Amino acid sequence: MPRKIEEIKDFLLTARRKDAKSVNIKKNKDNVKFKVRCSRYLYTLVITDKEKAEKLKQSLPPGLAVKELK
C-alpha cells in the first residue's frame, strides 16, 4: 500500500528504519520521486528541486539498496 511523505526529515527517518529494504529514485523532467519500500507500506516523497534531490540521494543510509529509474 502506498503512503505519501511530505517532509524530507520524515523520509530520512523512514529510510533508516529496520524494515526498510530498498529505495527507488524516479526522475521526471519536473520532479524527482523517492520511494522507500518498508514491510507494510511503500513511502513516497516528491521533490521538485533537483539540488535538494541530489543532497537527499547522498544522505541515504549506506546499507540500503538504491535503484535509479529514468
Curated annotation (Swiss-Prot):
One of its GO terms (cellular component) is cytosolic large ribosomal subunit. Keywords: Acetylation, Cytoplasm, Isopeptide bond, Ribonucleoprotein, Ribosomal protein, Ubl conjugation. GO terms for molecular function: structural constituent of ribosome. InterPro entries: Ribosomal_eL38 (IPR002675), Ribosomal_eL38_sf (IPR038464). The keyword Ubl conjugation applies. It is found in: Cytoplasm. Coiled coil: none annotated. Its main location: cytoplasm. The modification N6-acetyllysine is found at residues 9, 67. One of its GO terms (biological process) is protein-RNA complex assembly. There is a cross-link at residues 4, 9 (Glycyl lysine isopeptide (Lys-Gly) (interchain with G-Cter in SUMO2)). Belongs to the eukaryotic ribosomal protein eL38 family. Component of the large ribosomal subunit. Component of the large ribosomal subunit. The ribosome is a large ribonucleoprotein complex responsible for the synthesis of proteins in the cell. This is Large ribosomal subunit protein eL38. It comes from Oryctolagus cuniculus (Rabbit).
